[in-house]
Structure formats: C-alpha cells, structure tokens
Design a protein with these regions (language model features):
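Short catalytic-loop micro-motif centered on adjacent basic/acidic residues
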Residues: 97-98, 183-189, 283-284
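Active-site groove signature of glycoside hydrolases
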Residues: 104, 168-194, 273, 277
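C-terminal beta-strand-rich structural cap/linker in extracellular carbohydrate-active enzymes
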Residues: 430-452
Length: 452
C-alpha cells in the first residue's frame, strides 16, 4: 500500500495563516516558517500524517498569480526555510504536498513580461493561449489573451506547447531535488490539458517513489482525471456539497447515493474528502444546525476516501466569503488561542479522536463499505475487514431515533469509540438473532466497534 492510501491530510493556506500582506510587498512575516512548523506539529498531534501547504511560491497577491515557481514567496521566507520545514515534517513521519499552479501565471511572470514588452516579436508569445494583438483589456496592454475564470490577472498558459510542458516538468524536478516534497495538488486540474497530465504522471513515476498527484476537479466524471494514466485522485467536491446539504435538508439519501455512484464510477479510487477549504465557506456558516459538524467529521474519516482537515476547522471556526474576497476563509490564527481545545471543544475533541482511530483501526481505511440502514434522517454503514467491523451511526433528526439492522459480522456487543469525546452522549445498543438495535440521541452520531 502506498503512503497516500492511508494518509490523513492537514491543509494549510500559508499566506493566510501567517497573516501575510494581501498584496506582495516583499516583506517576510517574522518567524513565518516557525509558526507553520508549530501548526504541522499540532496536525501530527491530532493524527494528520500529511501536510498539504499552498500556494507557496512567489506571487503578486493570493498565491495563484505565480511570478516565480522556484522561489518561496518572500512574504513567508526563503527556500532554505521551506526545505527545513519539509525535513522537520519528514522527521515526524509527515509527507508534504505543495500546490502546482500550472494552468496560469501572474502578469509579472517573466514570459508574460516578455510578451508585453515585445508583442509579436516576443520570444515567449506561444507560451500563452489566445493572444490577440488586435484586442485589448482593462490593463490597456494593447492585446488580449486567454485567462482563468474571466480574470486577466491569471494568464492562461498553453500546456500543449512542449516548452511550457518542459518548464513545468523541470520545476517539479527542482521542487523534489531542492525541497524533497512528496507530491503536488494540481490547481484547476479540471481545465488542464489531458496529455499534459499524462506527462505529469510519467514524470511522477520517475522523480520519486510514490510521488503523488491530486487534481482540483469540481464537476464531471472524476474517473477521466483519476486513473492509472493521469492523476492518483481528485478532490471530491460532489460529496463536499452533499455533506452539508444532506444535513440541512435532512436527506442522507444524497450522501449515500453520492458515495455509491462515485465508488462505482471511479472503480474504488480513493478520492480526497473535505468539509471545507480555502475556496468554500466553513461548515459553521453553511450548516443550519452546528451539532452536525460532528456528523460530517465522522463521515469524512469513515467513508471511502482520504480525509483532510482545513486548518482551523478542527476548532470549529467560522469563515464566510465577502463580496469579491476569499480572505475571510483564510484567516491568521494563533495556536495559543486554542491550547485547551482538545479537552474543552467538542469539535476538536472528536477530530483528535478520529485521528487516533484512523491510525489504530485498518478497517476504517481499507474495510469494505456495507450500507446497513438508510432513511432521510438516519444512516448506518459498516467498514468491514478480516471479520472485524466498525459501524457508523448517524441521526440528523431533532428527535431520538432507533436504528435496527442486520449485523455485518458476528458480534455480541459494541463499544462506543467516541464515548470519551467532549459532549458525548450515551448510546444504547442491543443484539439478538444476528440483528442490532441502536438508540441514538437527537442530532447525534458515533462509531461503534463490534466485539465478539
């Protein structure tokens, strides 16, 4: 099994966490990488075995308008400091993944500066898409060009140009040689050229054993991107939507159907599971009942896939988009403000417990998913491996509920694995004639380990 198959990710948006200037002023936040290292240590303490950190490299503003792929953003520090950060993570047993923003660059990228200066005679004009010297734009460049999402700040690269491909391939080799990273999250993979991604997979197989490629894909048939020829997996935005809307609408059918469909569609490829990230609002701002944060955390860790936590979400923090700005989703935080959270905060307590369980119980990672009971307000499924099983039980209703289902394995009793978490409630179970009954409190969820 590759390292990423049983990984638990911790996602850090470093420019936000460290409180960097929103526009690059070239000034480093003092001690930024010391702070990032402390957060990576915290992630290890709650069971996260991999750090996804990004965007990381020199840019003009939010990190995705890249200026220099081979220079750590000066607002954060230096290449040497990032190299040390990776080494410290590796010493703790954590892998490190960075953002690969290969679809577009910022306007200060060297090749685009050449295009602005030399127009039709530019050495690098073919590095960009849809360049039209008869057009113009809001910057009054005297030409127009392809972009991402309608934003001319993000200049679309021509990934079918062999020079562009080789430039990116060499960048990845540099990242591995210089920093010893373990993989890449491909930004905007849903608009990347497929042949380019095939080339990335061939390169990944060469640069480092088990070098990992994850693609940011919102909609579509995920198996087009996640397959043996291209990416190892993609982001599961389809489930992300179902996780919060399925609770708001009291509709577990949405979540169960999504998982069944995706497992069949992707041939059991493990997708990247998340409840929130740097682009979407935090759970407390999307849920009608914040008690359901517990349910969603449990689902992210127990459904088929690779779980992740976005920094701060383990503390239940809020984050809501403002008009034209995602910065409220990417706040500056201090660990010292959460020093007692694991023993006082119900959200932190359950995330820490889930991290421990994920490490201790292989059935939660590799076990077959067996659906046991499904209604609009109640959901029960098991993860079964080698005769052992953990049963996940959830009730999103405002009244207590009784679940009853066939036991997935032979058992005589059940242990509540989350009974010691902050805010835990008693769950009554009984077994008879191969069937199990569970009495669940209202708006409550837990994991039961079956025992013979």
């Amino acid at each position: 099994m590759a390292w990423y198959d049983n990984a638990v990710f911790y996602h850090i948006y470093p420019l936000g966490l460290c409180g960097c200037a929103h526009e690059n002023d070239g000034q480093a936040v003092p001690g930024a990488f010391n702070k990032l290292n402390a957060w990576a240590e915290h992630a290890a303490d709650i069971g996260c075995t991999a750090i996804y950190i990004g965007p990381l490299f020199e840019s003009g503003s939010h990190g995705y308008d890249t200026i220099d792929y081979r220079l750590v953003d000066r607002r954060l520090g230096t290449n040497a400091e990032f190299k040390d950060f990776v080494a410290r993570c590796h010493a703790r047993g954590q892998k490190v993944i960075v953002d690969g923003v290969f679809n577009h660059v910022g306007r200060d990228f060297f090749a685009f500066q050449d295009l602005k200066a030399n127009r039709e005679n530019a050495r690098y004009k073919d590095w960009f898409c849809d360049v039209n010297f008869w057009g113009n734009n809001e910057y009054n460049d005297g030409f127009s060009y392809g972009n991402w999402g309608g934003f001319n700040l993000l200049v679309k690269l021509n990934q079918r140009n062999p020079e562009v491909q080789n430039y990116h391939y060499d960048t990845i080799r540099f990242w591995v040689d210089e920093f010893d990273i373990d993989g890449i999250r491909l930004d905007a993979a849903d608009v990347l050229d497929f042949d380019f991604m095939r080339g990335l997979r061939r390169l990944a197989n060469e640069v480092k054993p088990e070098f990992w490629l994850m693609g940011e894909v919102i909609h579509g048939d995920y198996s087009r991107w996640a397959n043996p020829e291209m990416l190892h997996l993609v982001t599961n935005y389809e489930l992300h939507k179902g996780l919060w809307s399925g609770h708001n609408d009291h509709n577990y059918f949405e979540i169960a159907h999504t998982m069944r469909r995706l497992q069949g569609l992707c041939h059991d490829t493990r997708l990247y599971l998340f409840s929130d990230n740097h682009d979407v609002e935090r759970l407390p701002n999307k849920l009608r009942n914040r008690e359901h944060i517990r349910h969603i955390a449990i689902l992210v860790y127990t459904l088929w896939g690779i779980p992740s936590i976005y920094y701060g979400s383990e503390f239940g923090i809020e984050g809501k988009k403002e008009w034209g700005s995602d910065w409220p989703l990417r706040p500056c935080l201090e660990l010292s403000d959460f020093k007692d959270a694991e023993t006082t905060n119900p959200v932190t307590s359950v995330y820490a417990a889930l991290g421990r369980l994920k490490a201790e119980l292989p059935e939660l990672t590799d076990g077959e998913v067996k659906e046991l009971q499904l209604t609009t307000q109640c959901y029960a499924f098991a993860r079964v491996l080698d005769g052992k099983a953990c049963v996940v039980v959830l009730n999103n209703g405002d009244s207590p509920a009784q679940l009853e289902f066939q036991l997935p394995v032979e058992a005589s009793s059940a242990k509540d694995l989350l009974a010691d978490t902050v805010g835990a409630q008693p769950v009554l179970t009984s077994m008879e004639w191969g069937r199990m009954k569970v009495q669940l409190p209202s708006n409550y969820a837990t994991i039961l380990q079956l025992e013979k």
